[in-house]
A protein has these predicted regions:
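Proline-aspartate-enriched helix->loop->beta-strand connector
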Residues: 75-78, 82-88, 106, 214, ...
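Basic- and aromatic-lined ligand-binding clefts that recognize polyanionic substrates
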Residues: 18-33, 136-197
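A short, structured surface patch at a secondary-structure boundary
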Residues: 26-77
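Short helix-initiation/N-cap motifs at beta->coil->alpha
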Residues: 7, 67-75, 201-211
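Extracytoplasmic low-complexity, Pro/Thr/Ser/Ala/Gly-rich segments
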Residues: 1-31, 44, 281-289
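Extracytoplasmic substrate-binding proteins
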Residues: 9, 96-170, 266-289
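Ligand-binding pocket segment of bilobal, Venus flytrap-like solute-binding proteins
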Residues: 169, 175, 202-231
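Structured C-terminal subdomain patch of bacterial secreted/periplasmic proteins
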Residues: 217-289
Length: 289
């Protein structure tokens, strides 16, 4: 197969057997189609072998080497693993690093200008093709779409309700929301819309809400989904005076995620989204009916 990407083309002559997952989330896409990488890259959450619970069973007892990007892509360590494919769609590859990696093995970097976190379906589809599993990956992606769409059909009263997808911790002393885009598509599929109130404060994928607008923004949404990772995160948010003093708090319009749910939303993968489709709707239903 031939993969087009930011730095040209990569030809992969046969199904790879020794795949290195060099970015933050590619392990999910590989495991989803039955490819167990020889190395994965840690992102967050301190999970065994940098693989979260929704994907652990797919490891089948394998113990991949765990890499990290703290000092950039560990080119020498990857070379020592003797891979036959390097998947680096979510690794911030630059031209120089691409040359070094592709001297080791065929390398699949980001498709275009998104150095990290290109839309999940694009990343999944490219990785599916790179490991000769394009059809299986397409059916997994379609399956995720169908799960969220089915939730929307089960809850017709959610249509048009305003939601905000919020970071689970304050950032520089204020709250941060996801802008409408691929990261919020799963909410749209369930019938929800992202509240317009964040638009003036958005750059790229996120909106940093000015402190004097926090209350008004929170109160503009019918439901607020905070991607908290612990009860302490929840306490810290509810201790914030503007969050505490909002109508959203008075009317109990907050959903606080578990660590695993927050991870699943962050990973946005064919393996993580089914967990979101199972666990988030009952929490939304408590607020939206």
């Amino acid at each position: 197969v031939t993969i087009d990407h930011l730095f040209g083309q990569t030809v992969i002559k046969e199904p790879p057997k020794r795949v290195v997952s060099a970015g933050y989330t590619e392990q999910d896409d590989l495991l989803a189609v039955g490819v167990v990488p020889i190395a994965v890259t840690n992102w967050f959450g301190d999970q065994p072998f940098a693989v979260w619970p929704w994907a652990q069973a797919k490891l089948g007892g394998a113990q991949p080497v765990v890499l990290n990007l703290d000092n950039g892509i560990p080119v020498d360590q990857i070379a020592g693993l003797k891979p036959d494919l390097i998947v680096a769609t979510n690794a911030g590859v630059d031209a120089d690093t691409y040359q070094k990696l592709s001297a080791i093995a065929p390398t699949v970097p980001q498709s275009d200008g998104d150095a990290f976190f290109e839309p999940w379906k694009e990343q999944a589809a490219v990785i599916g093709r790179a490991v000769f599993q394009a059809d299986q990956m397409k059916s997994l992606i379609d399956g995720v779409d169908q799960r969220f769409t089915a939730v929307g059909k089960e809850h017709p009263t959610w249509t048009g309700k305003k939601a905000l997808l919020m970071e689970g911790a304050l950032w520089q002393g204020t709250v941060v929301a996801a802008m409408a885009g691929w990261r919020t598509d799963f909410l749209n599929q369930m019938g929800l819309v992202i509240a317009d109130s964040i638009k003036p404060f958005g750059t790229g994928h996120r909106a940093v809400i000015p402190r004097d607008r926090v209350k008004a923004v929170l109160d503009s949404a019918d439901v607020l989904i905070w991607t908290t990772e612990s009860p302490d995160d929840q306490k810290a948010l509810l201790a914030d005076p503007d969050v505490a003093g909002s109508q959203a708090t008075a009317q109990n319009r907050h959903v606080f995620t578990t660590k695993e749910q927050a991870g699943a939303i962050a990973f946005s993968s064919p393996l993580s989204y089914p967990l979101v489709a199972d666990q988030l709707p009952p929490q939304l239903a408590k607020i939206l009916g």
